Amino acid sequence: RVIDATAMTSFRMDIWTPDPTAAPAVFKIKLVDFGANGTFAGGDDVEHEITLTAATTPALATRGWVTIDVPLSAFTGLTTRAHLAQLIFSGDPKTVYVDNVLLHR
C-alpha cells in the first residue's frame, strides 16, 4: 500500500540504540516513492537517503532516545511524494528501536 504524502512537509521518528554511535557509526533513513504506476522499478521511482551520525543534527546517541524531525525537502532526491512505498533503515548500530514514525505538516 502506498501513502500520498503530498500535503505533508516533515518526517518524524524516534530511535534508541544500545550500540556505540561514535564515528564512524552512521544511521541511514531512505524514503522511496514508487511513482504513479505504484510498482517497484517501474521506471518512475524516486528516492533519497539521509545519514545521521554523532556529529549531525540531530545526533546519534547511545542509550538515549533521539527524535528525528526533518523537512521532507531534506530528502532532495524524493521529487514526488504521492506514492511513498518504502521506508528503509540501514547503518552501523546493529540494534535500533524505532517508535512514533509519522509524516506531518
Language-model features: locations:
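Extracellular ligand-binding interfaces
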Residues: 1-78, 92-105
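Noncatalytic modules at the cell exterior or secretory-pathway interfaces
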Residues: 76-86
